[in-house]
């Protein structure tokens, strides 16, 4: 009583481990690196990437052979090449099954992301080429004023709304629940 339990993860909601989602008393989940806040599986807030930023991101990668992923409302959509051969693109062996279990195996991710540009929680760019990742990161930071960029592994560049991060989502949830941060 009086305690709110919140799980936070970079994963989209449906990819959260059962061991986390079955925690007795779990009230909220902050997922997709803070872009989504859910209560009992129902989305209560989403911080979407601006559609114009999605197009700028796609413009930045247009000439590069990179793997793209998109998170939409709790689901992962990934380039079919990555899903079928994740180790070839730097996926760590412990994430192999997670990667293979994504919900959308997309042949043309650029077209998919463009078509769904109004509903994206997060975009990941995956490449084993560090110089390419750094160039793309710099290019996207210059082109997009309304995004937050982070990395979870050496091969990932993760892009979300500037309104999204796990810390910002926790602040948003505390404000919504009228809980001061000193109580977190």
Give the label of every model feature segment:
Residues 60, 64-66, 71-184:
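Conserved acidic, metal-coordinating active-site core of Asp-based
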């Amino acid at each position: 009583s009086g305690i709110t339990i919140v799980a936070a993860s970079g994963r989209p909601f449906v990819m959260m481990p059962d061991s986390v989602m079955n925690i007795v008393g779990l009230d909220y989940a902050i997922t997709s690196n803070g872009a989504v806040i859910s209560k009992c599986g129902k989305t209560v807030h989403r911080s979407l990437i601006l559609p114009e930023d999605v197009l700028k991101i796609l413009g930045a990668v247009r000439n590069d052979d990179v793997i793209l992923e998109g998170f939409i409302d709790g689901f992962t959509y990934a380039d079919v090449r990555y899903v079928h051969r994740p180790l070839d693109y730097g996926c760590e062996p412990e994430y192999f099954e997670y990667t293979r279990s994504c919900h959308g195996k997309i042949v043309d991710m650029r077209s998919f992301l463009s078509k769904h540009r109004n509903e994206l929680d997060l975009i990941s760019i995956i490449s084993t080429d560090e110089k390419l990742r750094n160039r793309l990161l710099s290019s996207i930071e210059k082109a997009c004023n309304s995004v937050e960029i982070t990395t979870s592994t050496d091969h990932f560049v993760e892009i979300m709304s500037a309104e999204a991060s796990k810390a910002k989502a926790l602040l948003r949830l505390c404000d919504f629940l009228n809980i001061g941060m000193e109580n977190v």
